[in-house]
């Protein structure tokens, strides 16, 4: 796959007449929770020619593709290899607003294409991102996911409980260390283990073992000990009242992102 996915991405570049800035893996493989049944979730950022950007023709800001195990193109949903790409303008807008999806892409530890571009951007983000705002984004996303999952009790599974915990760990990591979390849930859990009740760590490790053995989508009843811990954690986060700290933090240097885009697109024309 380390060779095949970059080959597929090069074909995407040719078919859509785009240039991929960087491409990464997201999800369970980057969390180090993948099993033999895990699919591949590939995300990429692309840009077009200057001519395309100043054309009256409308080009899509997002490209979604799917491939089966034989690398035949199929619909994206449920595919063995799911690909989703954002145009650089869309992606940089999300990045500048501290969107956690955009942050997770730049923070991925599995890179298929454009490692130099990705690492340069990651260094910039680490030094310029509004850490309290990132914390709030992870916190609110975790709370929203937990509420949504509990609302669909007949669809509760191991993976969903781990997803909420992964977001909580990301928020806790930013709060404690004032920097971006690891993309690996395992590493974040190890770093924060002393901050978390022993019974919660044990339960999460139990779910991690289930996920890695291929039981991530197994339907489960409500796990009361985790639900209680999640709700209490959300209340603790809410009581931090970080709105003032968010305002006090410097805004991201948008000029850097603008120049980064301009350099790529204009250079491509020369």
Q: What are these regions, as identified by a protein language model?
A:
Residues 49-50, 96-99, 114-115, 157, ...:
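Alpha-helix initiation/capping motif
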Residues 74-77, 88, 107-109, 145-152:
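Short acidic (Asp/Glu) patches
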Residues 245-270:
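Acidic, carboxylate-rich catalytic segments that either coordinate divalent cations
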Residues 84-131:
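Glycogenin-like
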Residues 116-249:
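Conserved nucleotidyltransferase catalytic core and NTase-mimicking acidic/glycine-rich helix/loop elements
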Residues 1-20, 24-37, 43-104:
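Metal-dependent nucleotidyltransferase catalytic core
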Residues 95, 168-175, 264, 268:
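Generic structural signal for hydrophobic core residues of well-folded globular domains
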